[in-house]
């Protein structure tokens, strides 16, 4: 079963690590879509899992922009 990264784990990452994870997830999604189009994709569920991971990362980034949560090590 393909499982994504829980939000609480993403909240523990720094902004740079989140950006890196986001870039990697977008690359993986591109590759999965390409495999799906060519009929080589064996795990269709992985597409949805990666999409949800991207959404979670965007959510954590937005929470920090709004001040709803802080990056680890940032004590206010």
UniProtKB/Swiss-Prot annotation:
The protein's UniProt keywords, in alphabetical order, are:
Ribonucleoprotein, Ribosomal protein
GO BP, sorted A to Z: translation
InterPro entries in alphabetical order: Ribosomal_protein_uL29 (IPR050063), Ribosomal_uL29 (IPR001854), Ribosomal_uL29_CS (IPR018254), Ribosomal_uL29_sf (IPR036049)
Under Pfam families, the record lists: Ribosomal_L29
Q: Name one GO cellular component term.
A: cytosolic large ribosomal subunit
Q: What is the annotated signal peptide range for this record?
A: none
> GO: which molecular function terms?
structural constituent of ribosome
- Keyword Signal in annotation: no
The record's similarity note reads: Belongs to the universal ribosomal protein uL29 family.
- What NCBIfam families is this protein classified in? L29 (TIGR00012)
HAMAP family reported in the protein's UniProt record = Ribosomal_uL29
The entry's protein name is Large ribosomal subunit protein uL29
Q: Which organism is it from?
A: Corynebacterium kroppenstedtii (strain DSM 44385 / JCM 11950 / CIP 105744 / CCUG 35717)
Q: What is the lineage of its organism?
A: Bacteria, Bacillati, Actinomycetota, Actinomycetes, Mycobacteriales
User: Gene that codes for this?
Assistant: rpmC
């Amino acid at each position: 079963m393909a499982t994504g990264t829980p939000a609480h784990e993403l909240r523990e990452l720094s902004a740079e690590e989140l950006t890196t994870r986001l870039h990697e997830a977008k690359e993986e999604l591109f590759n999965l879509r390409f495999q799906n189009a060519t009929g080589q994709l064996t795990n269709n569920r992985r597409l949805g899992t990666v999409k949800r991971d991207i959404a979670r990362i965007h959510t954590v980034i937005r929470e920090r922009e709004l001040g709803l949560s802080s990056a680890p090590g940032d004590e206010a």
